[in-house]
Amino acid sequence: MIVFDRLWQTMKHKNISTYQLRERCGIDSKTIRRLRANDNIETKTLNKLCTALHCGIDEIMEFVDDTAE
């Protein structure tokens, strides 16, 4: 499963609020809710996030194996 915990850590480290992120990326509150819920996100949204935060994809998301026995 893909999780976005690193996004919130990166935002905190860079002192960027959710509102500022929305303004920089041009994303809506629905997209923020989807990120918080680790729901599907379009690749162009991921691109906007990386561009706005000046970071790599590994700083906003990670793969967590949820098939552990």
Identify the role of each PLM range.
Residues M1-Q20:
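A short, Lys/Arg-rich alpha-helix, primarily the initiator
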Residues Q9-T10, M61-E69:
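Short, charged recognition helix plus adjacent turn
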Residues K12, E23, T51:
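Alpha-helical residues within the helix-turn-helix
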Residues N15-R33:
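Short alpha-helical DNA-recognition segment
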Residues C25, R36, V64:
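DNA major-groove recognition helix of helix-turn-helix
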Residues T31-N40, N47:
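Amphipathic, hydrophobic secondary-structure cores in small proteins
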Residues K48-C50, I60-M61:
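Hydrophobic micro-packing sites on short alpha-helices
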